[in-house]
From Swiss-Prot:
Protein known as: Septation ring formation regulator EzrA
Keyword Transmembrane attributed: yes
Ranges facing Extracellular side: 1-7
Record topological domains on the Cytoplasmic side: 27-574
Transmembrane segments: 8-26
Coiled-coil spans in chain: 102-141, 274-350, 459-520
GO CC term, one of those recorded: plasma membrane
Family named by the database record: Belongs to the EzrA family.
Cross-referenced InterPro entries: EzrA
Record membrane topology: Single-pass membrane protein
Source organism superkingdom: Bacteria
Function in brief: Negative regulator of FtsZ ring formation; modulates the frequency and position of FtsZ ring formation. Inhibits FtsZ ring formation at polar sites. Interacts either with FtsZ or with one of its binding partners to promote depolymerization.
Length: 574
């Protein structure tokens, strides 16, 4: 056999071996893919879809939810019956083809199975998601229904337990409860007939009406309690108190109290009747008005009770106070009459006392008898309180005025006595001032001093004349006494000033001799000052002239002389 043939045979054998090895490798790879697909199929089939379907089925869906559930359930049935069986067949076919080394067709079957598994996987995910949505939606709807029913049942129980607290509103509340019950029935009917949208709207209305009625029923008992308990009790209390006050001789400015009682009772009945409409804002507003009218009656009674206490106290005090003020006025009149015999008094006091007497007389005529017969009066105590307080205020003003008048007249005699004493003192002082001036041996008396001296003398004579009258004008005496006091004080000051100026001028004129011979200014001032001193008797001008000249040549000399004089000055010995 030739070598060429041998090589050909060897090559063929090698190719067969290689082809076999490649076939074995491909078959193993396909076996692995087929096994993987089988595992995916089993994993999908093992998903708890049946359990989830049974769980949703147990919710007893109705309407559109039930229809949707049936569609998804049927899709799952189709998958389990058809799709999984078809996948199983294709896997079996792929295994056979792979075992017979028909790799191309086997690969096609593997790809087909993989595509089917992908579709099934997506369908199962959609089914499970839809089932979960149905479950959540049903649970949500169930919770809404349960919540609404719980609200209704709680409201029903609350109304039943507190039925006595709703008064005339109970029929309307029952009617509203039946309407809500009807709405729940409509919800069930619509939900069962497959109309979830309208059923949801009806459920919303039923829940809203339940909440609204619950809020109303929470507020009604307080309003009813006012109408059926509080107001009647207060009215009974007022009527009982009113009768008792009438028995105790109370009278009232308001003459329609009985009618007001009746009007309030009618308002209570009317508001109770209107309450059946459940217009709570209007009922509360009317209750407020009723309470205000009741409170106003309480205020009337309390005002009269408080007024009685004050009026009773004042009725006892007024006669005593009036008698006291009247006695004061009589004493004041007598005192003024006594003083009038000796003094000319201001008409103000007499007129004031007459005004007091008029006020006292008016109270005696109009109020005294009322106070003394207080227990028999047929007037409201509030009016009597005002009357008594007005009279007491008048008496207080009268008493205060009496004290002012008394203060004005009580010191008249003292004023006269003091004026006479002052006059004697001032006359003596005038003589002492005159002697004091004479002892100074002045060249003459300044004209301003003479004017002040004679003016003071005239004022003392005027005071003396006034005190010498048969009836003394005490106001004039007081005025003249004050004028004399000021005049004598001014005259004393002027006396000291004149004497000081004259004495210091003499001393400075003598002192100027030191400078006259060589200071022409001092010589000129000396001559001028000497003329003012001896001829014109103007001691102030003379002092100013010579002191100014000396200050120019010897500063401080004037102060030295003034200080020395003040230490040794002689005082007037009164």
């Amino acid at each position: 056999m030739s070598s060429g043939i041998i090589l050909l045979i060897v090559a063929i054998v090698l190719l067969v071996i290689i082809a076999y090895l490649v076939g074995v490798i491909i078959r193993k790879r396909n076996d692995s893919l087929i096994t993987s697909l089988e595992e995916r199929k089993q994993a999908l089939f093992a998903l708890p879809v049946n359990d989830e379907i049974e769980e949703v089925k147990s919710l007893h869906l109705i309407g559109q939810s039930q229809t949707s559930f049936r569609e998804w359930n049927q899709k799952w049935v189709d998958l389990t019956v058809n799709s999984f069986a078809d996948i199983e067949n294709h896997i079996f076919e792929a295994e056979n083809l792979n075992d017979t080394f028909n790799f191309i067709r086997a690969k096609h079957e593997i790809n087909s199975v993989e595509s089917q598994l992908n579709l099934v996987e997506e369908d199962i995910a959609s089914i499970r998601e839809a089932l979960n949505i149905l479950k959540e939606q049903e649970e949500k709807n169930s919770a809404r229904v349960t919540h609404a029913l719980d609200l209704y049942e709680k409201l029903q129980a609350s109304i039943s337990e507190n039925e006595d607290n709703f008064g005339s509103t109970m029929p309307e509340i029952d009617k509203q409860m039946k309407n809500i019950e009807t709405e729940f029935s409509q919800f069930v009917a619509l939900n069962s007939s497959g109309d979830p949208v309208e059923a949801s709207e009806v459920l919303d209305r039923a829940e809203e009406h339940t909440i609204a009625l619950g809020q109303i029923t929470e507020q009604i008992p307080a309003i009813v309690a006012k109408l059926e308990d509080d107001f009647p009790d207060q009215l009974d209390d007022l009527e009982t108190g009113y009768r008792r006050l009438l028995e105790e001789n109370y009278h009232f400015p308001e003459k329609n109290i009985e009618a007001r009682f009746q009007e309030i009772r009618e308002s209570i009945r009317a508001n109770s009747s209107e309450l059946v409409t459940l217009d709570l804002d209007r009922a509360r507003e009317e209750n407020t008005h009723i309470q205000e009218r009741i409170d106003s009656l309480y205020e009337v009674f309390e005002r009269e009770i408080a007024a009685y206490k004050v009026a009773a106290k004042n009725s006892k005090m007024l006669p005593r106070y009036l008698a006291h003020v009247k006695r004061n006025n009589e004493q004041l009149k007598n005192e003024i009459a006594r003083l009038s015999r000796k003094y000319i008094l201001s008409e103000t006091e007499s007129l004031t006392v007459k005004a007091f007497e008029k006020d006292i007389k008016e109270i005696e005529d109009s109020t005294l008898a009322v106070a003394e017969q207080f227990g028999l009066q047929e007037k409201p105590f509030s009016e009597l309180q005002v009357t008594f307080e007005r009279s007491i205020k008048t008496l207080t003003n009268v008493e205060s005025g009496q004290m002012d008048v008394f203060a004005a007249v009580k010191d008249i005699e003292k004023i006269e006595s003091q004026a006479r004493h002052n006059l004697d003192v001032y006359v003596t002082q005038l003589h002492m001032i005159k002697r004091y001036m004479e002892k100074r041996h002045l060249p003459g008396i300044p004209q301003d001093f003479l004017s002040a001296f004679f003016t003071t003398s005239s004022q003392l004579e005027a005071l003396m004349d006034e005190l010498s009258r048969g009836r003394i004008n005490i106001e004039a005496v007081s005025r003249l006494s004050e004028v004399a006091t000021v005049a004598i004080a001014n005259l004393e000051d002027l006396t000291y000033q004149v004497v000081q100026n004259a004495t210091l001028t003499e001393q400075l004129l003598q002192y100027s001799n030191r400078y006259r011979s060589f200071e022409a200014g001092v010589q000129s001032s000396f001559e001028h000052a000497l003329r003012l001193f001896e001829v014109e008797n103007d001691y102030q001008a003379s002092f100013d002239e010579i002191s100014y000249a000396l200050e120019t040549v010897e500063p401080g000399v004037t102060d030295r002389f003034v200080n020395s004089y003040e230490k040794t000055r002689e005082h007037i010995r009164f």
